[in-house]
Amino acid sequence: MAWENQTFNSDFILLGIFNHSPTHTFLFFLVLAIFSVAFMGNSVMVLLIYLDTQLHTPMYFLLSQLFLMDLMLICSTVPKMAFNYLSGSKSISMAGCATQIFFYVSLLGSECFLLAVMSYDRYIAICHPLRYTNLMRPKICGLMTAFSWILGSMDAIIDAVATFSFSYCGSREIAHFFCDFPSLLILSCNDTSIFEKVLFICCIVMIVFPVAIIIASYARVILAVIHMGSGEGRRKAFTTCSSHLMVVGMYYGAGLFMYIRPTSDRSPMQDKLVSVFYTILTPMLNPLIYSLRNKEVTRALRKVLGKGKCGE
C-alpha cells in the first residue's frame, strides 16, 4: 500500500480558512464563539436528557444521540483549526489527517441514518400511538441507534483506507481547514476517477435510502396531523415535526451540495464555506431548534437549575 511507502514525517499542510488580517481575525473569534455556543448547547442537552427521568423516552434518547454526534463533530475539526491559527503552525500528520477523516465521515454518516430513525419514531408516535411503547421499546431503539453508529463508522473506515491507499507525491497543501477526503484526492498523483465514481454511488445510496424513509414517514405524519381533532395535539405534533424537518433540510441540503458534486466542479472556497455551515453552524443550531419551542426541555432545564440554586 502507498501508506507504507510514505513516512509519517511527510505532514500535510492545512491552508485554513483565515489569514491574520483584522477582518479574518474577527471571523476567527466569531467561529470560536459559535463553537463555544455549540459545545455548551449540545453538552447541556445531553446532560439534561440524562439527568431528567421524564425525558427518558425514545424521542429524547434519539435526540441525545444527535447532540452527542454534533458535539463530537465540532470537537474533531475546530480545536485543530484554532490551534493551527493561534500557533502559526499549519501542519497535520498523516495519522492525524486519517483520524480527522474517520471521525468526520463516521459522525456525518451516523447522523444521516439517525435522522431517518428519528423520523420513523415520529411516524410511530403520531400514526400508531397505541403501539408506540411496543414498537419503540428500549431494545429496538437501542439497536437502531447502534446500527446508525456502526454504518457510519464502516463508511468512514472504507473512505479513510481508500483515500490513503493513493500516493501523494506532489503538493501536500490541503485547501481546507481540516482533512476532508475530497480535498485530499485532488492532491493524489494517482488516477482517482474510479474511486470518485464509487464514492458518488455510495453517497447517493447513503442519502437516498434515509431520505426515502423520512419522506415516507412524514407523508403519513402530515396526513395524520391534518385529520387530528385536538388542536393541542395538532400543535404539539407540528412543533416536534417542524423542528426535525428543519434539521433534516439543513443537513441533507449541505450534504448533497458537498459530496454529490464531481471533483472537477469543486471550488476550495465553496467547500470551506459549506463545511463551516455543516460542521459548526448546524451543531450550534440543533439544540436551539429542538429546545426553544419545547416545553418539556424548558421545564427540565428549570428543574435542574432550580435544584442547583437550592444546593447553593
UniProtKB/Swiss-Prot annotation:
Its main location: membrane. Residues 1-25, 80-100, 159-195, 260-272 are extracellular. GO terms for molecular function: G protein-coupled receptor activity; olfactory receptor activity. Keywords: Cell membrane, Disulfide bond, G-protein coupled receptor, Glycoprotein, Membrane, Olfaction, Receptor, Sensory transduction, Transducer, Transmembrane, Transmembrane helix. Glycans are attached at N5. GO terms for cellular component: plasma membrane. Odorant receptor. Belongs to the G-protein coupled receptor 1 family. This is Olfactory receptor 2M5. The lineage of its organism: Eukaryota, Metazoa, Chordata, Craniata, Vertebrata. The gene is OR2M5.
